[in-house]
Amino acid sequence: MKNIEALIADGGDITIGAIHPIECAATAADSHNTVAALVRRDGETLSALLKRLDKAIGRFYVHDEIIDEVNGN
């Protein structure tokens, strides 16, 4: 989970929990912006969700691409 570790080391944060009406989502933000927002899939473990979040953060770092499943972007 090197990308999550790097984000937190740089002052960012991650959050896992409900975002009404979504039962479970994982979000990541740096000190300025949301860099990823993922919706937990049916049957997806928290471990798998965290791995997807780590990959999404990596895509932000490499390609400046924000993955936002919460808002449909």
Predicted segments with their positions:
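N-terminal acidic leader/helix
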Residues: 1-27
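Amphipathic alpha-helical packing elements
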Residues: 24-68
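Short acidic DE-rich linear segments
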Residues: 69-73
